[in-house]
Structures are given as C-alpha cells and as structure tokens.
Amino acid sequence: MGMRMMFTVFLLVVLATTVVSFPSDRASDGRDDEAKDERSDMHESDRKEICCNPACGPKYSCGR
C-alpha cells in the first residue's frame, strides 16, 4: 500500500472510532444523572419506606 492509502485508512479508523464513542458517552451520562438524582427510588425509600428498586430488598414495598 502507498502512503496515501495508509493515511486514508488511518483517517477512516479514527473517524469511525470517534463516531461510535459519542452515543455510548451520552448514554452513560444519562445513567449517571439518574443515579445521582435525589428523587430516585432508593433515595425516596428513606423518607416514605417505599422503594420500587429491586436493590432495596424486601424491607420496602413498591407502593405502585
């Protein structure tokens, strides 16, 4: 392969990697925001003893 062809392949790989990484970054940010949200199910359980998150365990009811 010539230098132009190798450079073109390199640019395509960099571009493809950049395009693929953007949606996964946004999705993880959304999950982080949900986890940090003060009104999440587990945070509500401290005040109302109602939790719809399975991680709360049998101690709390869902209340839905």
UniProtKB/Swiss-Prot annotation:
Where is this chain primarily localised? secreted
Which residues are recorded as modified (Cysteine amide)? C62
**Ranges of Basic and acidic residues compositional bias?**
26-47
Q: Where located?
A: Secreted
Q: Where is this region: Disordered?
A: 23-47
Signal peptide bounds: 1-21
Q: Which residues form the propeptide?
A: 22-49
Tissue specificity statement from the Swiss-Prot or TrEMBL entry: Expressed by the venom duct.
Query: What are the entry keywords?
Result: Acetylcholine receptor inhibiting toxin, Amidation, Disulfide bond, Ion channel impairing toxin, Neurotoxin, Postsynaptic neurotoxin, Secreted, Signal, Toxin
**Single GO term (MF):** acetylcholine receptor inhibitor activity
* UniProt comment concerning the protein's domains: The cysteine framework is I (CC-C-C). Alpha3/5 pattern.
Give the UniProt family note. Belongs to the conotoxin A superfamily.
Q: What else is known?
A: Negative results: shows no or weak inhibition on neuronal nAChR alpha-3-beta-2/CHRNA3-CHRNB2, alpha-3-beta-4/CHRNA3-CHRNB4, alpha-4-beta-2/CHRNA4-CHRNB2, alpha-4-beta-4/CHRNA4-CHRNB4, alpha-7/CHRNA7, alpha-9-alpha-10/CHRNA9-CHRNA10.
- Biological function: Alpha-conotoxins act on postsynaptic membranes, they bind to the nicotinic acetylcholine receptors (nAChR) and thus inhibit them. Is active on muscle nAChR (IC(50)=113 nM on adult subtype (alpha-1-beta-1-gamma-delta/CHRNA1-CHRNB1-CHRNG-CHRND) and IC(50)=142 nM on fetal subtype (alpha-1-beta-1-delta-epsilon/CHRNA1-CHRNB1-CHRND-CHRNE)). On mice muscle receptors, its higher affinity site is the alpha/delta nAChR subunit interface. On Torpedo receptors, it does not distinguish between alpha/delta and alpha/gamma acetylcholine-binding sites.
In Swiss-Prot or TrEMBL terms, this protein is called Alpha-conotoxin SI
Q: Which organism is it from?
A: Conus striatus
